Amino acid sequence: MKKILLGIFITIFFAGGALAERYVMVTHTAGTDPFWPVVQKGGEDAAKAIGADFEYMFHPSGDMAEMAKLIVAATATQPDGMVVSLPDPDALGPAIQDAVAAGLSLIHI
């Protein structure tokens, strides 16, 4: 599983055609689901493999409005790419659309 995630993240990071510097991942975990630490580790490993910085963000409450604020805050830092989990498209869609409109490379998982 870790090798698959590492491969996915390396592919994503190189998809832009240039060596990236900084990536952000925003997920909807409340910090208790055992799935997300594996995903976080995959992002960290992929970033390390290409010499990039990686920041993992989540709101402890799991609240969608708070997650949208994290996406907006991450967008303001202009990372080279962003990965966002999308449990509620209605709540997160506007923040994601704004990130894309700002020119960020963004994928959702």
Predicted regions and their residues:
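Bacterial N-terminal signal peptides
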Residues: 7-15
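A residue-level marker of the well-folded mature domains of exported/periplasmic proteins
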Residues: 3-5, 18-107
